[in-house]
């Protein structure tokens, strides 16, 4: 029994057109970068809110170190963005943000005071919606 497939050329044309709309004038990287940066903002805001509400906050160094990193590209993950304290941007001798987030069991154990994971859990749906809308607008700007 032969199988007749129709519309495959139209599908390929549509997919190619979507890719072209994401890469307007070779600026597709800028479109993806902007979408990721927009999606990172709600989580970053919540993270800063969580860090500022910690009753043990002393210097404000952790709060001030929370940043949205640059959009990077990797073969395995595609484009990605990081939000948090980036070790290379930490200006103090002692790097302690991870110990605040996870706690530690050293000679004087300290409990965890998470600020990163709760921010993601609280605002992830909002960020995913920003990504969906951004891609939808980039692919089909007439809707």
For every predicted segment, state its role.
Residues 1-82, 88, 97-143:
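Short, Lys/Arg-rich flexible segments
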